[in-house]
């Protein structure tokens, strides 16, 4: 292109940008008002919407230019690490679209709260002994700065999984332990069992992630002095202990002779009631088991709060919201309450928050619940962003690993993300008929590379495990694929869908956030937290 044509092209673009107005949501024109020189905004054809892409790009560049990174060591008073368990990039994309569609928009233009954070990188998730990782090894990397083996909780790769005798000298110090030693307040929140792999790695050390209660310990572990994960939470003796613990997993904290408020028995064989011990070992302590007692919790007069809201994992957020399961707080509510308790400490705090059930829904092949739990995580991050300042709080959002969850086909703009694929015709007009495979059968936009496969259930996501894996394709013409009970088809039939090995995103803001850049090893996350809050030096000085 010669200089004259280039000038004319730029003039045309800039002139076009000055004419017309964009659609109501500023991106797609499908619900827009007519532009001065545009069409009526139907089918995404409003030329003013095209102009808005250019304007939005300019605005984004201007915003990025105005950022002044704070890379001073120790500048972060507080750290909040959010982990979407199993929240790969395809899950983020699909949840973004679903949230937008639930708001009445086409969806693609939507952004989850954490997608607005200014700094972004990718993390390589493999474990020392695994190309595709598990949550124990990945979370250990994030909270200790050291990669380890599959199934191992905050211990180095020198251990043999499941062997207590191999653990001597292998414990790794976690960011939560460093914070407590430095005098900061600490908290762990999860919608999974609080003794499950991801939250456990913040405070416990074990060669086997499944040692959640003492009844899970093999004889060798007992003989060699290993403790179960729940007991380690109570025995956490750094600083003033953990200040806030909220999630599921009550059964690991109460004796097997005790029945909890849900009518379910505990799992402890040693007779210890760790909930009672929590109340006795801390002053200004509280223990809550349902949403009512949680909401009544007085944060001003509570320094140590233990909330165990389910015998096992907490409910999926879809079920909590739509199916009358009202006895549990949301992830956003737990996050807000935790911050209110922790920020009373003038030295600052470290809080780790996990959306644990994204992973579980994917394992069951139930995309709807996985995406709703991702949206719930977005709401929790939004609350944290509102309650903290980017000037003194490093806030990061990431995943421990991905899943074999795909977004496929050529669906038209705004096609229901959980629906059957409907494409555009040769003229770019959306078709009224479903796209079909080589055998003439319709297919969904989202699906899985492996797993249990198709099922259309009226019950919860985990009920899929009561049925055998479905091999091959099924005719979906008369199936409501947008129902929360629909379980997507899978290419390779397995008893459970697997994790995936691709990189996961890291979103960040606040002091040290600009150190999240490029593609990094997952253990880099710890080192950013340590640099931003100067945890090691503060902990060392406090001893």
Language model regions located:
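C-terminal motif of bacterial Sec signal peptides marking the signal peptidase cleavage site
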Residues: 15-18
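Collagen/collagen-like triple-helix recognition
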Residues: 20-47
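Bacterial N-terminal signal peptides that target proteins for export
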Residues: 1-7
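Short coil-to-helix leader/linker segments, especially the first N-terminal amphipathic alpha-helix
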Residues: 38-74, 112
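Active-site-adjacent structural elements in enzyme catalytic domains
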Residues: 74-102, 168-183, 190-193
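A post-motif C-terminal structural segment
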Residues: 52, 76-77, 87-92, 97-140, ...
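His/Cys-centered metal/cofactor-coordination and adjacent catalytic loops
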Residues: 154-169
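Alpha-helix C-terminal capping segments
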Residues: 143-145, 177-183, 387
């Amino acid at each position: 292109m010669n200089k004259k044509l280039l000038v004319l092209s730029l003039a045309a673009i800039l002139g076009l940008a000055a004419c017309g107005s964009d659609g109501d949501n500023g991106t797609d024109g499908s619900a827009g008002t007519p532009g001065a020189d545009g069409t009526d905004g139907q089918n995404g054809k409003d030329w003013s919407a095209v102009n808005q892409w250019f304007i939005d790009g300019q605005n984004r560049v201007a915003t990025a230019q105005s950022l002044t990174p704070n890379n001073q060591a120790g500048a972060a008073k507080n750290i909040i690490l959010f982990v979407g368990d199993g929240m790969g990039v395809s899950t983020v994309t699909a949840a973004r679209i679903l949230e937008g569609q639930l708001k009445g928009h086409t969806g693609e233009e939507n952004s989850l709260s954490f997608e607005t954070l200014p700094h972004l990188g990718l993390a390589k998730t493999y474990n020392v002994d695994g190309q595709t990782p598990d949550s124990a090894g990945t979370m250990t990397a994030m909270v200790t700065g050291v990669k380890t083996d599959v199934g191992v909780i905050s211990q180095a790769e020198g251990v043999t999984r499941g062997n207590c005798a191999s653990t001597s000298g292998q414990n790794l110090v976690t960011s939560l332990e460093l914070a407590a030693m430095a005098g900061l307040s600490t908290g762990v929140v999860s919608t999974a069992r609080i003794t499950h792999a991801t939250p456990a790695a913040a405070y416990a050390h074990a060669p086997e992630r499944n040692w959640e209660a003492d009844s899970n310990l093999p004889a060798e572990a007992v003989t060699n002095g290993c403790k179960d994960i729940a007991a380690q939470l109570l025995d956490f003796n750094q600083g003033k202990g953990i200040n806030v613990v909220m999630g599921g997993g009550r059964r690991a904290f109460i004796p097997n002779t005790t029945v909890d408020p849900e009518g379910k028995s505990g799992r402890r064989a040693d007779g210890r009631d760790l909930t009672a011990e929590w109340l006795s070992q801390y002053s200004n302590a509280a223990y809550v088991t349902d949403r009512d007692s949680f909401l009544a919790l007085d944060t001003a007069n509570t320094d140590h709060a233990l909330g165990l809201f389910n015998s096992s994992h907490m409910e999926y957020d879809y079920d909590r919201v739509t199916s009358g399961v009202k006895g549990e707080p949301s992830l956003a509510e737990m996050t807000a309450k935790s911050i209110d308790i922790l920020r009373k400490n003038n030295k600052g705090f470290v809080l780790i928050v996990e959306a644990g059930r994204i992973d579980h829904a994917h394992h069951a092949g139930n995309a709807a619940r996985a995406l709703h739990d991702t949206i719930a995580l977005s709401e929790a991050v939004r609350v944290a962003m509102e309650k903290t300042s980017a000037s003194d709080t490093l806030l990061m959002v990431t995943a421990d690993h991905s899943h074999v969850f795909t977004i496929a086909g050529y669906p038209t703009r705004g096609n229901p993300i959980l629906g059957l694929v409907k494409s555009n015709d040769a003229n770019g007009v959306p078709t009224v008929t479903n796209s079909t495979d080589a055998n003439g059968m319709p297919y969904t936009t989202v699906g899985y590379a492996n797993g249990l496969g198709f099922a259309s259930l009226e019950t919860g996501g985990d009920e899929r495990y009561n049925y055998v894996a479905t091999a091959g394709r099924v005719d979906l013409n008369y199936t409501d694929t947008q129902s929360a009970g629909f379980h997507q088809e899978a290419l390779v039939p397995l008893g459970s869908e697997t994790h995936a090995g691709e990189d996961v995103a890291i979103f960040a803001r606040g002091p040290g956030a600009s150190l999240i850049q490029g593609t990094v090893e997952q253990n880099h996350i710890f080192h950013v937290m340590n640099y931003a809050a100067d945890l090691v030096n503060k902990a060392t000085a406090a001893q």
